[in-house]
């Protein structure tokens, strides 16, 4: 269906006084119909409620008015602002020869709604038509490649292809295009390429600086991130947040996250939700209950305390610092809770030796019609394991697929093996592992071996260890020690000697004080 035609008919004066406030501001008699319509459309485009402007389009169709290019572009913009992509595309397709601006408006509309496939097809059509893409067009292609909502699999080399097109077509590298290039290279893990583009900036760009800092921090290049931060002349809250968040991820640098948090306030910047969430994460890594309480007090004064992200971060921090009562107090005071809040509290109870409270909360969660996620089930199953509730744990495991259509992952199977094994049902745990729909991974056999070590079952320990060593013999040094302990507890000293000889030959040593399930 054609919305309007670009055929030659005499324009009729539009009999409308409801288009906008435009007629009240202009002497309508002095305007041509085209200027009148263009002005009315612009009024609606600029208004917070642009949908009323669609009446103008309806009148254009009814009267047979021939819109010029200016009106057509404004109709395109109007429909995009209203979120009506199909109408916008119809207007676009009616253009005899779409201009660069028309292409860019339509492409930006697709980008805004996450329609990456449609965006790329339109860019392809643009190229075939002979219309040259400008920096803005290419920046939108780059942004589309970073779109999280897209299900389309894009080539990893897309950024390099766009970059090559920029160079080949001699497109000017303005701030928008440089920012898009740097951000895309960073998100694809190509930091050297990102840095090369970053160095071409004539003027400092705080957005690019932040992208580079985040990219370096994500890959553990802390010194490079610091270099960018220190050479950034005009810093803002976002740059500081990138440093606070980056430092917070590792136990080696978490203390520096707190230091940066203090420094930014001395520099005159007030923490926002992102800042608080990152520094709370640092307190969790440091298990620093005291510092966490101080940050909590500041959050209370800041006005962001009621935000659901703050509540979830705080209760998770308190739980990891061993302050489970403080965590529960935060949980109870939260005005709004989501699945992450409930999961953090359940997991916190389980890890702090309160399995009964964890399971009670898991039951209450369902009463509030909050659907558990995979991590929630892990917390509940772990609580059952520590309480010895085999039947309850298996019921929860079965409910994953039965009630929530969630296919259990390896971690959930490992929890059940651990649950049965801890309770002494070693044969049942072994049969459960063998009956799994997928091949058991190393965590499954490690859980069974741990239980065999606990109960001194030599036969199953040998089987579990054998399967475990087939998968990653050198990455489970504690497994050798566990098997050796089982043999020793059953006076099988020859086997103990053989195990130690294998460890010596493979240069495998057990680090004192680490869990046997940990990986080097």
UniProtKB/Swiss-Prot annotation:
GO molecular function: RNA binding
Keywords on record: Mitochondrion, Repeat, Transit peptide
InterPro entries assigned: E_motif, Pentatricopeptide_rpt, PPR_At4g14850-like_plant, TPR-like_helical_dom_sf
The organism's place on the tree of life at top rank: Eukaryota
Record region (Type E motif): 444-520
First and last residues of the transit peptide: 1-19
Cellular compartments annotated: Mitochondrion
Chief location of this protein within or outside the cell: mitochondrion
Entry-linked SUPFAM superfamilies: TPR-like
GO cellular component, one term: mitochondrion
Positions of PPR repeats: 68-98, 99-133, 134-168, 174-208, 209-235, 236-271, 272-306, 307-337, 338-372, 373-403, 409-439
GO biological process: RNA modification
Similarity section: Belongs to the PPR family. PCMP-E subfamily.
NCBIfam families: PPR
Listed name of the protein: Pentatricopeptide repeat-containing protein At1g28690, mitochondrial
High-level lineage: Eukaryota, Viridiplantae, Streptophyta, Embryophyta, Tracheophyta
